[in-house]
Amino acid sequence: MARREGASAAWDRARVAARELGERAGPSAARRVPLAEALGATLAADLPALVGIPDCDTSAMDGYAVCGPGPWRVTGRVLAGAAPADEALTPGTAVEIATGAPVPPGSTSVLPYEHAREEDGGTVSGETEPDRHVRRAGEDTRPGDVALKQGAPVTPAVLGLAASLGHDALSVRRPSLAVLVTGDEVVHTGIPGPGRVRDAIGPMLPGLADWAGARAEPPARLGDVREGLAEALRSAAGAGAGAGADAVAVCGASSKGPADHLRSALEDLGAETVVDGVACRPGHPQLLARLPEGPAVVGLPGNPGAALVAGVTLLAPLLSALAGRPDPAAAAPDRAELSAPVRPHPRDTRLVAVRLTGSAAEPVGHDRPGSLRSPAAADGYAVIPPGWSGPLAEIVRLPR
């Protein structure tokens, strides 16, 4: 099994290595999907305007579209949804108009109801200014304008924008993540019996994948058998060459105990190891590799708290690179002053779960690799490198 990084890579270097591996693999394949299926994906192409916004001169207020100075004789009414009028207003005339309705040719402004005075004989008067409360055609966006560049995450606002620009579908990237949950002791429903544990990592991965612009596939559940794990990885590698997984997350089996077979299974398949252990607490026994002509593999520790740290360290940078978007944990780095003492580790970077309150970060406590109580109540992790003396620390965000 070829190796690239030495054992126990520095935490920040491991994140860079994961990002670089995703970038070398290239962005995942683009697919054109209906708007209803695009939320959370990443734009694979620029988003052009197919129509102008607005597509004709429209009223920004309920009131009267007027021509020239007042008073004005009201000659009709125009509601939203009406076709633009062919006949132009002439000086001294007006039409009653609804917000969003097309203003007639010749309109110089719109006089809102609240500024209008009704006069005898079907006339109105009031103070207005040229072009006031008229939205001109293409004022916001002209046909052909690029409203968003490729690489933008598809948010609810992006879906609304795309619809307003005339799109029914979008070209997007959403890498697929195959999930292998290992462990003879792991149960997936109900209350575990003596000597068993409930799978707490598998339920986290869809949210982590979404956060990074990817999609987690339903998990495959495996026992602690080397051959079974190798076969599952081989299957993922074959799928990765076609329309299958772009990356694989293996839950458990990344340590070096008697039932941890990930390294040996990867060796059987001739995988290239990129990161073999990360100098961080929790999350030390995490692993990053690439199968020959196949997807990247992230080995997550079996302890749930450690697995979440590995998700932030290796999985999110890898998946976001495959999606062609920034790493969500590093897109907006923060620094905050810790409100309580934290002791650094002599050799490893500590990831301490914190709540953010203004410019301060409050350690949550319950920092145990086997527990999710701490990150479940946190906004992010404070990064505490060896030799740290505080009080400022880098903050890495958690998905919310």
Give, region by region, the residue ranges found by the protein language model.
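N-terminal intrinsically disordered, low-complexity, charge/repeat-rich segments that act as generic
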Residues: 1-19, 205-212, 247, 261-267
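Solvent-exposed alpha-helices and their adjacent loops that cap or buttress functional pockets
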Residues: 57-59, 84-90, 103-104, 117, ...
